[in-house]
Amino acid sequence: MAVNKGYTGYNKELNAMAATHAYIRLSTLMSQIESWQATRASVLTHLGVMLNGVSKLGERSFFSRTKRFGAHTSDGDEIFCDLGGEAVTQILSRLTVALQSARGEGAQTRNAKRGAAPGTSQVENEEQGQTDQTLAISNAVAELMIFVRTKDFTMNECYTQDSFEAKYNLKWEGSS
């Protein structure tokens, strides 16, 4: 008799986690953050690309009752990170807010109320604001890089296939 492939021990909590948490290879996450750090000098010209990258970071529905965690890898030793943990979610939210602010989301409404051409002091303030925005983005990217290198993140939010299944008491039945 053939055994249907899938997890035993899979439950509602894991189903919700699979739907709401994004997972990403640790190597891909590090490369992406390094790429964002490299754009530091021209970050304001790459806002849309960075914002899109942050919003699409990782993959949801990475596993399910019938889809094995990390199954699309050639071996089970590759490390995947959960981007749905509270700390990393807060850091990514701060980065998103910094990018949205620098992009001017909300500024169009404020500027429309002015109605007059900007004066010299207003232009100087806007130039200072751009410097502040660049600094806020750079700080948020640096904070993310520092965090993903911490033992707390790598030990609690990063998994191989075996460590994920052991943590959540999952047993894969059938062939992968």
From Swiss-Prot:
InterPro entries: TMV-like_coat, TMV-like_coat_sf
Localization per record: Virion
One GO molecular-function entry: structural molecule activity
Disordered: region residues: 103-132
Cellular compartments per GO CC: helical viral capsid
Highest taxon above the source species: Viruses
Residues annotated as transmembrane: none
Keywords tagged on the record: Capsid protein, Helical capsid protein, Virion
Membership in a protein family: Belongs to the virgaviridae capsid protein family.
Role, per record: Capsid protein self-assembles to form rod-shaped virions about 20 nm in diameter with a central canal enclosing the viral genomic RNA. Isoform N-CP does not seem to be required for virion formation and systemic infection in host plant.
Name used for this protein in its record: Capsid protein
Organism from which the protein derives: Soil-borne wheat mosaic virus (strain United States/Nebraska/1981)
